[in-house]
C-alpha cells in the first residue's frame, strides 16, 4: 500500500458507479468510458435514484483514493479499476465553478506517482495498487484538469491505462505491467490534455493524442503493444 502526502478530497462509492451490491452477481460490466459501447446506458433496472454519502443513503461502502484523477472507474468481473496521480508536494487547490485563466504555462514542479488501482467491487477493499511511473510532469495542465484524466479500459483479462504524455500501460489482473509505450510530450490546448480515453476494438487498442503541434491517432496490438497503425488527425 502506498502512502503519500496528498489525498483526494472525495471517496469512491458503489453508488457513484451506479451499482447496487444486491445486484452484483447480475450486474453488467462497465469496461470503458461511458460503459459498454460508450453509450452511457445501463441495462440494470434496479439502480438507486438518489443517494447521500454523508447520510449513507444507498451507499454500500466508501474507500479513500490517493491523489488526483478525473478518470472514471471501470468495472469488470467484480473488480474496479481506476487511475490517479499523486504529487509529493502541495499543489494548487482546485476551484469550483467556471472561470477564465485556468491554464498554466509550466508543469507542476513536484514529483508525481502515476497509479493504476484495483478494488474489490463487493467490499471496496484494495486488491492492488501499481505505480507505473514516478516522474516530474512533462506538460502543464489546466487548473481544472489532472494528470490522470483519461479513463482506463479493460477486457477483463488486462487493464489499459493512458496518461497522455506520461505513457500507455497494459497490466494484467494482478497488477503486473505487461507492456508500456512512452510518447513525445506536446503542447496541449490550455492544458486540457489528450482529448480522449482509450478504447478496445477486437484485438486493437486505440488512443488519440489531441495537441497543438502534431495531433494523431494510433492503434496497438492489445496483447503485445506492437503499433499497428498511426495517422494524423
What annotation goes with each model-predicted range?
Residues 1-12, 21:
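Bacterial N-terminal signal peptides that target proteins for export
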Residues 6, 12-13, 31, 223:
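Intrinsically disordered/low-complexity terminal segments and short unstructured peptides
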Residues 23-233:
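Noncatalytic, solvent-exposed loop/strand surfaces
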